[in-house]
Amino acid sequence: MIYMPRFLDLFAGAGGLSEGFLRAGYEAVAHVEMDVAACYTLKTRMAYHWLRDHNQLAVYSQYLNREITRNQFYEYIPHGVLGSVLNYEISTETLPAIFKDVDALVGDGPLDLIVGGPPCQAYSIAGRSRSETRMMGDQRNYLYRHYAEFLRRYRPKYFVFENVL
């Protein structure tokens, strides 16, 4: 059996970083995202990859063509695949629950990579141009600290921290 490096996606959004790593042969252990709509997109993409890997893309086509509902579509997918998408806002208050859920998904296996890009509105050039003083009080400025907590806890071989200026 070929080893597939395993990764965790934080601040996952609709899964752009995940998509690249999945296509490169990595296994997604979990995605943490606060936006419900983005979580549905992540679940759909994870379902697509599972169906592709199991030669069942006809089911994906049925869903895209609205021949089956989202719930019917999800019935084809193992719970562990859909359950890898965790709908949380990453904060000091939610970290214990997130760690508990991620720990369960990681299990005894290694976590090779953590990827993620916290929201950058608070300190991007565009965000700062709206209000220099508001930047200091914006809690999004400090989300990198939570990312660092995941690095300390899981000690991956690699990490990708994406952001913009």
Descriptions of predicted regions:
Residues 1-165:
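Conserved active-site and SAM-binding loop architecture
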